[in-house]
Amino acid sequence: MKHLLFFFAALLVSTAASPQSEAYARDIITVLASEKYEGRGYYKNGARKSAKYLRKTFKNSGLKPVGGDFFQPFNIAINCITGKPELALNGRPLVPGTEFLVSRNSPTIKGTFKVKTLNTAPADLDSLLAVTEGQDLSETFIATANTNRVLMEENVFDAAGVILLTKQLWWHVSNGHQVMDIPVIKAGITAAPEEIHTVTVAVRNKYHEAYTTENVAAMVRGTRYPEKYILLTAHYDHLGRMGKEVYFPGAHDNASGTAMIADLARYFAQNPAPVSLLFIAFSAEETGLEGSKYYAQNPLVPLDSTLFSLNLDIIGSGSTGITVVNGSVLPEYFSLLTAINEKNTYVKNIGKRGEAANSDHYFLYKNGVPAFFIYTTGEEYTEYHNVNDRAEGLPLTAYNGLFGLVRDFVLLLPIPR
């Protein structure tokens, strides 16, 4: 690999993306993170609207479908929070999205209930259960700062509902595959009264047992080895809507990565690589990596002919560099990446991690395809899984450098004969 690196390094122009490239990506981020695309979720078909937009984007760049279509459809089970969620504590209404969140596995409920507040160590679930043992809480909400994940998945108190008091209002959809028998609501500690006596709540849900969503895939054929493939991937889905009035833009996570693979697709459509490049915008990453898992089980090109898969997720910052998941377990590929960066100083630093099932590289790697997941690092932008992850605040600090690094890595990957 070292000989290949130095052979090809002399042929590369040491430049990152152009300002026009970053502007192109920012336009895509602005579109995908706009309210028109509904947070790219499943209530009001935001994910489907986004898939159609990306198909058009790939086509306009001159890419071709794999087989007869750009779409690879599959089904997921998902619960959606619809209508207008409402929450009032001691009679004072809280603002949805910024002061409270409704867990994605919550059922329809409406009414006013008394509240039992349990003050105990945040992770000590056994103490909470001991305090409530033998009590009839069927018409009572439990309010607690306990952070045990079980509270979002099981009705351990046999209560009417649970209010989780938290400093960080992060929303997730990975628990939306089924519906609990009670609602779970996250409320901001600063928005909640010191003593909660009553809760008035209104939640509506709609459960989809088999919602059809789609991966979006497009190809640039290789000039010398068209039957060898490199995958460039990012998930385009996000959290969607919590009712009619609140949506989660998802600019950093992951309109940013989606925009870069669209930008790379445009570049390689005009400058084809020796091997074929497959660009895949995955759906249903936020629900549990379901889109990439489906692809790994139903690949559009042979996995044994896939040389590498590079996944981009959360790349809107970068003041301190990037981190590479699987960098520790694929040292030769990581050495290639760092050698390219040392030559061109594309990003400030490249950190590495081991295996992690935290993005769409995972199931490809587990099915035998060498794979990296790259994300940017830096404190200049920290919005995550909330209503403030918007396009207008996204700095794209390391965008140009990361573009150049990924482009060169694709061109320098060794091609087995």
Regions found by a protein language model. Give the residues of each.
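Soluble metallo-hydrolase cores and metallopeptidase-like ectodomains found primarily
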Residues: P107-F113, Q168-P249, R266, Q270, ...
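N-terminal signal peptide c-region/cleavage motif recognized by signal peptidases
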Residues: V13-T15
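Noncatalytic luminal/extracellular "stalk/propeptide" segments of secretory-pathway proteins
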Residues: E38-A145
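N-terminal hydrophobic or amphipathic helices/low-complexity stretches enriched
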Residues: A17-P65, V220-G222, P226-E227
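Acidic/His- and Gly-rich active-site-bordering loop/insert found
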Residues: L32, F58, F74, I78-T82, ...
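Metal-dependent peptidase/peptidase-like ectodomains
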Residues: A273, F282-T382
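Second-shell loop/turn segments in exported
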Residues: E35-N45, N60, Q72-N75, T117-N119, ...
